[in-house]
Amino acid sequence: MQKWVCVPCGYEYDPADGDPENGIEPGTAFEDLPEDWVCPVCGVDKSFFEPVS
């Protein structure tokens, strides 16, 4: 699964890990994250993320 990085702070969202502290189960693709999900480090929305190449 594609990893995504937060451009402002460098946090990397890995679908294999999810974001359990914020209710996101492991195995959740970035595209399947809720629209109101934000970076757990700096709080920006999904539009600030880019795919990791």
Curated annotation (Swiss-Prot):
Name the PROSITE patterns for this protein.
RUBREDOXIN, RUBREDOXIN_LIKE
Domain Rubredoxin-like, residue spans: 1-53
Q: Which residues bind Fe cation?
A: C6, C9, C39, C42
Q: Which cofactors does this gene product need?
A: Fe(3+)
What are the boundaries of the signal sequence?
none
Instruction: Kindly state a single biological-process term from the GO annotations of this entry.
Output: alkane catabolic process
Q: Which PANTHER family match?
A: RUBREDOXIN, RUBREDOXIN-1-RELATED
Its job: Functions as an electron acceptor for pyruvate ferredoxin oxidoreductase (PFOR).
Family listed:
Belongs to the rubredoxin family.
Specify the protein name.
Rubredoxin 3
Its taxonomic placement starts with: Bacteria, Pseudomonadati, Chlorobiota, Chlorobiia, Chlorobiales
In the UniProt record, the gene name given for this protein reads: rub3
